[in-house]
Amino acid sequence: VTGRVAHGPNSEQSGFESLLEKDYLLCLQFDASVEHFEVQSVQVPVPGHRKPYTPDVLVRYWPGPRGGLIEPDLVEVKPKDILKRKAEEFAPKFKAAAAFARTQGWNFRILTEESIRTQRLENIKFLREFRRRPQDSAREQAVVNMLSSLGTGATSASLVQSLEPSGGVDSFAIWYPVIWRLVYLRKIEIDLDVPMAEIVPLWLPNRRAS
């Protein structure tokens, strides 16, 4: 399976060679600690092999909260069953990649579906459904302004109730798609590691919920 996945507000394109790799790229796109990533940009010489080994992704991170540098990750994405079945074939490649990464000040990591296909991925896939929703500038600005006035402790439900004090059966149907689109665009933030429900804590960037 190969293809390209669009991400971000400008629909940037990244290539993938498996569905698991596609899922990992989606997770990277919503990871605030990631500065940028490069797909198959590194070739690692493997002793005894004519062809170099090309790991899937090189991930670079923003400095930590105290300004400390975070070492980049050179990442291979593989399902557990393939890793087990082809362990002998992969061993020299992974050994070479780990050694090469150390010379660059990187970490070499092997990720499987256990660490990729999580609640975070489920939430990201839900939010992606709103990426092509037509922009509604007036409502989007109203959401941002109201969330700013509510401050920390706001939830999706309290935000809608503040936008539509009179309530009504259609208020959530009207406002939730606007809110989720803004979350997808990262103009509003939520905790992606917890299940999304009708009441979801949310906040503006750099104004983390308490």
Give, region by region, the residue ranges found by the protein language model.
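Electrostatic, structured charged patches in enzyme active sites and in nucleic-acid/phosphate-binding
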Residues: 1-210
